Amino acid sequence: MKTTINQVYKHVGEEVTIGAWIANKRSSGKIAFLQLRDGTGFIQGVVVKAEVDEETFQTAKSVTQETSLYVKGVVKEDERSPLGYELAVTSLEVIHEATDYPITPKEHGTEFLMDHRHLWLRSKRQHATMKIRNEIIRATYEFFNKEGFVKVDPPILTGSAPEGTTELFATKYFDEDAYLSQSGQLYMEAAAMALGKVFSFGPTFRAEKSKTKRHLIEFWMIEPEMAFVEFNENLEVQENYVSFIVQSVLENCKIELNTLGRDTSKLELIKAPFPRITYDEAIQFLKEKGFDDIEWGDDFGAPHETAIAESYDKPVFITHYPTSLKPFYMQPAPDREDVVLCADLIAPEGYGEIIGGSERIHDLELLEARLKEHGLESDAYQWYAELRKYGSVPHSGFGLGLERTVAWICGSPHVRETIPFPRLLNRLYP
């Protein structure tokens, strides 16, 4: 019976056939141990010389790393295995023998592994990270579908930008200038006026010349927009969403979290509501902590965000940033025009901002004034301003960076390990 590693629990005591690759192997006299992987998981195959023919045992001893083969064996329960099962191998059929596989079990440098990213993905830790990434995406669709959101796909090629054009990749669109999208937000606002509650999930591109462990040039964002939703309701959606995806990973990715050595006790604390502090309070807190490099009106750097996050065991919202620090579309606070109704959600354990969101300006006159202040008066934004001419309503939204969120939940040291093929400042291949 042909099956996959993640389904062996259904076949205890039965002989099954699995198409697999050799992840690793070792032998001890009359027993060979094969670490098998098939994409769905990892399992140990045990080959006992006395229980198989000579050809099978010699194959088990000589088979090379990443050789593909069909493995036939009896499924047995094994409490010592992370999977809970092992395979008592009865026969091996080699499909393709791999020779000189470059990523051997020894330690390798990061640049070497990145040069071989197409192969590094096969490793146990990278496999676990990709499975957790997939679970976050799956849970995202479940959450927003359950909450009545409609999935909308904004364009990747745009003629305007929500935050200006200084960090955009420009290209020619026939005789016009176009940009790779850094956010679908403006289009999602239009969609929210038609469909009420919408979300998008897709790639975004930022030409930031940054080499930090938090930055990618190409990354994926989840961007919801909601009509008739104001600032505090927006924060509630965010904390409920983040709580949901974390709990989904805890429930459905136990083996993967164990593979990564993740301390799940920290993730178990991630349940709404999340603490909230204002930008003013954050500045005061940092000064009390001895940060002399920060003044009101300055943006926070990674050390500042980490210091603030260390005071909490959950993500923390920093709200009401100065107007001067934020994009043109954010609604001013009703009692203070020098701050806006926005929030950044800072993840624990030094992973930084994972969400940025705000209530959006819904008054046409104010929006036009803000566009003028930011030097964005052009036909490219005419359609966006026009949304405020026909039944404008209060509305809010946010964007969650998938890779930073995956890094936090996995406990990964760098976002480059959270996307299959990372695009970095100095890396376009593979």
Swiss-Prot record:
Source taxon at top rank: Bacteria
InterPro entries membership: Aa-tRNA-synt_II, aa-tRNA-synth_II, aa-tRNA-synth_II/BPL/LPL, Asn-tRNA-ligase, Asp/Asn-tRNA-synth_IIb, NA-bd_OB-fold, NA-bd_OB_tRNA
First-listed, main subcellular location of the protein, grouped into a coarse class: cytoplasm
Catalysed transformations (reactions): tRNA(Asn) + L-asparagine + ATP = L-asparaginyl-tRNA(Asn) + AMP + diphosphate + H(+)
PROSITE patterns, per database record: AA_TRNA_LIGASE_II
SUPFAM superfamilies: Class II aaRS and biotin synthetases, Nucleic acid-binding proteins
One GO location term (cellular component): cytoplasm
Keywords: Aminoacyl-tRNA synthetase, ATP-binding, Cytoplasm, Ligase, Nucleotide-binding, Protein biosynthesis
Subcellular compartments: Cytoplasm
Pfam hit, one: tRNA-synt_2
A GO BP entry: asparaginyl-tRNA aminoacylation
GO terms for MF: asparagine-tRNA ligase activity; ATP binding; catalytic activity, acting on a protein; nucleic acid binding; transferase activity
NCBIfam families recorded: asnS (TIGR00457), PRK03932.1 (NF003037), PRK05159.1 (NF003483)
Oligomer and partners: Homodimer.
Family to which the UniProt record says this protein belongs: Belongs to the class-II aminoacyl-tRNA synthetase family.
Protein name: Asparagine--tRNA ligase
Native source organism of the sequence: Bacillus licheniformis (strain ATCC 14580 / DSM 13 / JCM 2505 / CCUG 7422 / NBRC 12200 / NCIMB 9375 / NCTC 10341 / NRRL NRS-1264 / Gibson 46)
